[in-house]
């Protein structure tokens, strides 16, 4: 997986999360909503931090995607999901502002936090599921 400085990984956060959730013993309708919000969040980062020459239109597209991410996850009416998503935005933007690269490693603890809210099996097990899903295996 090639990563471009200042961008999210080419790997889809939405698909990775859905693969991780697929390994859970029980289905949870919240997982689809969280995955959808992750897709919007990644679109926002990609638009805002596409690299050199980000235009005003890119910023507007990114802002709209962030708004859709927040609106989507807020449908769950569970502050824990919103808190983790907020940390994802803060940590990713902070890393980029410091000149770093946003990689899957950056997102893994946050994705695990979201998964743990759904699975209640602990952050360590949730992180293992995320890593397995990123490698193309179900958790």
Label the model's feature ranges.
Residues 1-139:
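All-alpha prenyltransferase/terpene-synthase fold signal
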């Amino acid at each position: 997986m090639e990563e471009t400085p200042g961008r999210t990984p080419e790997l889809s956060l939405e698909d990775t999360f859905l693969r991780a959730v697929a390994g859970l013993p029980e289905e949870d309708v919240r997982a689809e909503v969280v995955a959808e919000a992750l897709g919007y969040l990644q679109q926002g980062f990609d638009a805002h931090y596409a690299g050199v020459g980000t235009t005003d239109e890119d910023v507007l597209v990114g802002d709209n995607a962030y708004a859709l991410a927040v609106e989507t996850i807020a449908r769950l009416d569970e502050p824990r999901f919103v808190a983790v998503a907020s940390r994802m935005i803060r940590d990713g933007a902070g890393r980029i502002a410091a000149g770093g690269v946003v990689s899957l490693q950056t997102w893994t603890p946050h994705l695990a936090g979201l998964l743990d809210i759904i699975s209640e099996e602990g952050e360590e097990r949730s992180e293992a599921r995320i890593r397995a899903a990123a490698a193309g295996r179900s958790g």
